[in-house]
């Protein structure tokens, strides 16, 4: 499961790149893609800030400081009134560009109690090995994912981004969303129908076998990063105080950080944190027990990708040719 999980993560991350590779693209598109990748790589090298509110407060502080510095030309002790002078914000155009959720490290996995799917007895009362068919089975199971924002990027800018948990053997994916501004928890669930066709089982002569199908459930937990680029400005007024005149102000978020921390487009990288916990069906197992010898053999029944249902909430499995214990 862990190897498949890591493989699934790699596949999920590479889907867009693979799509571009297998389709013929014009030289212009190739150049555009290379430029886009270069810009993305350059952004990832820049410093990342974890609280926009702090940057906004810094902008307001600098605004008041610069205002009183100008007033010192007329009132040498103007800076002594720093805590008395106020700022009244009147509007802003702050926004987060390209908010997205990225995996942060490898997830952990813990197998839970199996889900019973079905049971059948097959008896071969002849003197020769015989191929018998088990009955088909169907079961319903609810997959659930819970996502929590543990560290916001600040409450001043509202943004959300979706995240899909794709890594399980059934191919079922669960989608949830994260808030960049609120430490809230989202829980999404969906009922999945698992359809297991009859299996061809070769049974020894004069033998009864027990066939049990069950679904393994797994709890997958991990962490995520909430990333994006923030920009925008705030404007308002500084009310008059004593002899200090009223004044208007405006500052940009780009004014609150070192110029070396800015992306080429003047945006600032931000970084929040979150986690997720998904409980979902993983592998469909058929256990065949020879009741004469009590020997057991287990088989993983793969998903039938050729007969994939149009309904994403239905999983269809393949029919295998299985040798019961006692068959050489």
UniProtKB/Swiss-Prot annotation:
**Signal peptide per UniProt:** 1-32
Q: Which GO terms describe its molecular function?
A: toxin activity
Query: What is the name of the protein in this document?
Result: Epsilon-toxin type B
Residues in coiled coil: none
Q: Which residues form the propeptide?
A: 33-45
In the record, the note on similarity to other proteins reads: To epsilon-toxin type D.
Gene3D superfamilies (alphabetical): 3.30.360.60, Proaerolysin, chain A, domain 3
Q: Which organism is it from?
A: Clostridium perfringens
Q: Which Pfam families match?
A: ETX_MTX2 (PF03318)
- Entry superkingdom: Bacteria
Which keywords annotate this record?
Signal, Toxin, Virulence
| Function field | Responsible for a rapidly fatal enterotoxemia.
InterPro entries, per the entry: Aerolysin-like, Epsilon_toxin
GO annotations under biological process? symbiont-mediated pore formation in host plasma membrane
